[in-house]
Amino acid sequence: MTFTIACLDMAGTTVRDDSVVLNAFGSAISGRGLSPDGYEQAMKDVRATMGQSKIEVFRRILGDADTALDANAAFEHHYARAVRAGEVTPLPGAVEAMAAIRAAGLKVCLLTGFSPSTRDALLDALGWRPLIDLALSPADAGRGRPWPDLPLTALLRLGGGAVTELATVGDTRSDIESGLRAGAGLVAGVLTGGTPPAELAAAGATHVLDSVAGLPALLGA
């Protein structure tokens, strides 16, 4: 099978955040009327929906649309502060993997549940713009994961000819489900985000890798 586009998730797949995302969620929902039990349940929901659109997660947890928007803004502020402080760094092998994939003639697209502004701040802080062809957030595609919109938008914008030319990689069930729904020819899961290998396999991953460093070999790069 020939692949022309590789779609790589950011946090947990190419980017190490050492619980920065979880801490940002916790900070964003604290003091918003949740009981202690409600807070704990909300954080369980956050962990279970990692990889999905952040604003959609807040809407499910908090219910009220305006409160969700406020919480999302607080999340973005917390995460952006962590980025500026240098707390968010590349995972080992991520830069080399993207470089190898592009050198082999494939296009590289980074996918994230972050807003475009947070995504762009992260790209600039990491210096990754020269390494990629495109970066997409749910706001660019219509819906976030687990829907297929992000990889399908990458296919359209980067001029792919068929969905089977897509290869996707991520660290959560939502990443796997999105790739499968898009019809990608390769849907890989990685263990760097903490999801157990059995869970990634049960979600339908075609391959389970220790890290994104193993992706180029699967793509013949």
Predicted regions span which residues?
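N-terminal helical cap/lid subdomain that shapes the substrate entry/recognition surface
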Residues: 2-96
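A short, structured active-site edge motif that brings together acidic residues
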Residues: 45-46, 128-144, 165
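Short, acidic loop-to-helix structural element flanking the phosphoryl-transfer center
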Residues: 81-110, 116-120, 148
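Surface-exposed amphipathic alpha-helices with a cationic face
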Residues: 95-102, 155-156, 176-181
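Conserved Lys-Pro-Asp/Glu-containing loop-to-beta segment of HAD-superfamily phosphomonoesterases
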Residues: 145-176
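Acidic, Mg2+-coordinating phosphoryl-transfer loop and its flanking beta/alpha structural elements
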Residues: 167-207
